[in-house]
Amino acid sequence: IRRDLEQLEEQDSVKRIHGGVLYAGSSPKLPHFESRAPARWEQKRAIAKSAVQMIEDDDTVLLDGGSTTFEVARMLVGRPLHVVTTCLPVANLFASDTGSDLVVIGGNICPRSGVAQGPIAEGMISRLRVAKTVLSVAGITEEGFFNNNLLLVETERAMMKAADQVIVVADSSKFGRQSLAHLCELGAPDKLIVDDEIPEAWQLRMGAELDLEIASGVKEQKVN
């Protein structure tokens, strides 16, 4: 059994904790995750590894439903945290985790992503205060950060207001890509974590706007 668990842990399917094991497997079979999760997985995983290092034990963390944020959530399973999320797939990861407290935000559930959004979600979030909010985005241009749903960006703005620190996690393919709904200006988040394939021009641009962290390891893996 121990050997089987070690193999599953190497595959990132489970996370072993003291006295037990927790599921931390792949994203659920929702259109949002099925179409995106396999793409640029190495980049998303590198970004997630950097993001979880910013989160301290006993932090209150608010997580959205992006595929990169889901990777962050997988790596947080088993840690003593207060987790708040708008995303049902993320909530499912922590539902059986006795080491963390879980609050699930309700509202209008998007069937593609399993994410709560809209006025009910915004109302619940407005009554909360968290240490860190972690968000994914669909696009980044000179005009700012974008996502692909008007209700979603309204909810994410409430998530930003609720946090002492806002962390955006985005792989380098998002730069120069515009999506439907404008979320915020480039300098609005406190921190942006990207992979090491970010174009140099964007690296300089974003470094002038906010705290930019470049997650290393992707280029090295491709060389090897």
Listing of model-derived features with the role each one plays in the protein:
Residues 60, 82-83, 132, 191:
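A residue-level structural signature of the nucleotidyltransferase/glycosyltransferase Rossmann-like core
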Residues 10, 16, 43, 89-224:
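Conserved phosphate- and dinucleotide-binding cores of soluble alpha/beta proteins
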Residues 2-66, 73-78, 82, 94-99:
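HTH-adjacent hinge/linker in prokaryotic transcriptional regulators
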Residues 68-72, 175-178:
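Short glycine/serine/threonine-rich phosphate/pyrophosphate-binding segments
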